[in-house]
């Protein structure tokens, strides 16, 4: 055998060995894939879908829910009977291909099986999700119905146990309970006949009616109690109180109280219709209106009762208060009479006291009448209170006026004493100012001073005449005092001004000697200033002439002399 042939045989043998090994490996790999697919199929088949279907089936669904269940149930039946069988056949066929080393067909078959299992897996997920949704929806529907029934039963029990508290509303409440019961019956009929949409609408209405009626049932007792117990009790109390007040002598400004009682009775009676019709908002409003009217009547009675207390107190206190003011007026009259012996009293004060006396007499008639007729008055106490309080307020005003008059009268003698003291002071001041001027040894007295001086002197004489009159006019005296005060102030200022101007002129004339010998302007000013000083007695003009001339040659000299003078000026010693 040639070497070439040997090599060829060896190569063929090697290829056969390699091919066989590869075939064995591929078959094992496909076996593993097929085993995995078998396990996936078994896992899907063993899911509790049948149990879930039976659970939903036993819920006895109706209407659209039942239609949906049938569709999903049929889908599951198709899967469990057909799809799984197909997969089983395909697995068996793929195993045959694999065992016979037909790997291409085996691979293709395995791919198809994987796709089938993936589709079945998705379908099962959808079926189970749909079944779960049906269970949840049914549970919700059942729970909703049970909840509504529970609320309805509680409402029925509540109404039955508290029937007396609903009054006129009970009949309408029971009627609405029957209507709700009918709605439940209608719901059951529609639901059983496979019309879930309309059944749901009926259930919605029933639930709404239950909630609304529950709210009504909770509100009615309080409104009924207000209408049938509280308001009638208050009205009865008002009518009883009104009778007692009338028997006790009370009167009222309002003349329609009895008719208002009748209107309240009618209003309460009419409001029963709102209760019967369950018009609770209207019923509450009518109750509130009735309560407001009752409160208004209570306020009327309370007003008169409180006014009676005030009237009794005023009747007790006003006579003594009136007597007090009358006594004050008598004292004022006596004081005016006493002062009239010495002073002229103004007609205003005299007439004021007389007017007060006349007013007090008129007030006395009213007060005494009120005191005497207090137990038999035909007026409402609030009216009497207003009248008596007005009198009391006026008496307070009169008392204040009396105090002011008394103070004014007391000032008359004080003003007289003050005037007599001041007239002496002013006379002494006038004499002192005269001596002060004389001591200055001036060449003459300016007319401005003499005019003020003699005017002041004349005014002092006039004041003395007023004070020496048989009956002193104190108003005139006070006017003269005011005039004299201004006169003395003006005279004192004029005196200081004249003396200052004269003194400074003399000092500056003497000071100018140091400049007159060589300054013609100063010499001329000296001559003119001296002439005015000695002949015109115009010391201010004289000072102005010499000061201007000196300030030209020695600026500030006049200011220096003025400052020095003010520090050493001699004051008038009164």
From Swiss-Prot:
It holds the Pfam family EzrA. Residues 26-47, 105-189, 258-346, 375-415, 455-494 form a coiled coil. GO terms for cellular component: plasma membrane; septin ring. One of its GO terms (biological process) is division septum assembly. Keywords: Cell cycle, Cell division, Cell membrane, Coiled coil, Membrane, Septation, Transmembrane, Transmembrane helix. The chain crosses the membrane at residues 8-26. It comes from the Bacteria. InterPro entries: EzrA. The keyword DNA repair does not apply. Its main location: membrane. Residues 27-574 are cytoplasmic. Residues 1-7 are extracellular. It is found in: Cell membrane. The keyword Cell division applies. It is a single-pass membrane protein. Belongs to the EzrA family. Negative regulator of FtsZ ring formation; modulates the frequency and position of FtsZ ring formation. Inhibits FtsZ ring formation at polar sites. Interacts either with FtsZ or with one of its binding partners to promote depolymerization. NCBIfam families: PRK04778.1-4. This is Septation ring formation regulator EzrA. It comes from Streptococcus sanguinis (strain SK36).
């Amino acid at each position: 055998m040639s070497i070439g042939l040997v090599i060829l045989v060896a190569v063929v043998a090697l290829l056969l060995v390699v091919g066989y090994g590869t075939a064995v490996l591929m078959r094992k790999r496909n076996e593993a894939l097929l085993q995995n697919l078998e396990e996936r199929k078994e896992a899907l088949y063993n899911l509790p879908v049948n149990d879930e279907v039976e659970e939903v089936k036993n819920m006895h669904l109706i209407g659209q829910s039942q239609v949906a269940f049938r569709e999903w149930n049929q889908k599951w039946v198709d899967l469990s009977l057909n799809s799984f069988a197909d997969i089983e056949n395909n697995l068996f066929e793929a195993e045959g291909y694999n065992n016979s080393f037909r790997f291409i067909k085996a691979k293709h078959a395995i791919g198809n099986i994987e796709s089938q299992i993936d589709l079945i897996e998705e379908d099962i997920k959808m079926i189970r999700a749909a079944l779960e949704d049906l269970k949840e929806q049914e549970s919700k529907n059942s729970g909703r119905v049970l909840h509504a029934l529970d609320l309805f039963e509680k409402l029925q029990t509540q109404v039955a146990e508290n029937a007396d508290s609903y009054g006129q509303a009970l009949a309408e409440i029971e009627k609405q309970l029957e209507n709700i019961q009918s709605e439940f019956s209608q719901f059951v009929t529609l639901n059983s006949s496979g019309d879930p949409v309309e059944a749901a609408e009926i259930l919605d209405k029933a639930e709404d009616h239950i909630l609304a009626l529950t709210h009504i049932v909770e509100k009615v007792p309080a409104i009924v109690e207000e209408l049938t117990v509280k308001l009638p009790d208050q009205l009865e109390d008002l009518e009883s109180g009104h009778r007692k007040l009338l028997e006790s002598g009370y009167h009222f400004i309002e003349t329609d109280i009895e008719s208002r009682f009748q209107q309240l009775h009618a209003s309460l009676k009419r409001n029963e219709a709102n209760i019967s019709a369950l018009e609770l908002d209207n019923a509450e409003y009518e109750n509130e209106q009735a309560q407001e009217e009752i409160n208004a009547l209570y306020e009327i009675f309370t007003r008169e009762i409180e006014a009676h207390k005030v009237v009794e107190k005023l009747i007790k206190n006003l006579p003594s208060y009136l007597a007090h003011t009358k006594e004050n007026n008598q004292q004022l009259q006596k004081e005016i009479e006493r002062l009239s012996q010495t002073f002229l009293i103004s007609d205003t004060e005299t007439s004021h006291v007389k007017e007060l006396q006349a007013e007090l007499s008129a007030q006395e008639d009213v007060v005494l009448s009120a005191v005497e007729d207090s137990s038999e008055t035909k007026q409402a106490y609030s009216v009497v209170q207003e009248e008596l309080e007005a009198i009391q307020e006026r008496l307070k005003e009169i008392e204040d006026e009396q105090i002011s008059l008394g103070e004014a009268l007391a000032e008359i003698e004080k003003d007289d004493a003050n005037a007599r003291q001041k007239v002496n002071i002013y006379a002494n001041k006038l004499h002192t100012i005269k001596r002060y001027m004389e001591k200055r040894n001036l060449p003459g007295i300016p007319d401005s001073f003499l005019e003020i001086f003699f005017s002041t002197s004349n005014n002092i004489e006039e004041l003395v005449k007023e004070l020496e009159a048989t009956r002193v006019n104190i108003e005139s005296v006070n006017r003269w005092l005011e005039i004299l005060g201004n006169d003395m102030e003006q005279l004192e200022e004029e005196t200081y001004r004249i003396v200052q101007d004269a003194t400074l002129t003399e000092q500056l004339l003497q000071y100018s000697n140091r400049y007159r010998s060589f300054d013609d302007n100063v010499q001329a000013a000296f001559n003119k200033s001296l002439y005015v000083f000695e002949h015109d007695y115009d010391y201010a003009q004289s000072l102005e002439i010499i000061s201007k001339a000196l300030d030209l040659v020695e600026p500030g000299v006049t200011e220096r002399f003025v400052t020095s003078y003010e520090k050493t000026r001699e004051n008038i010693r009164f």
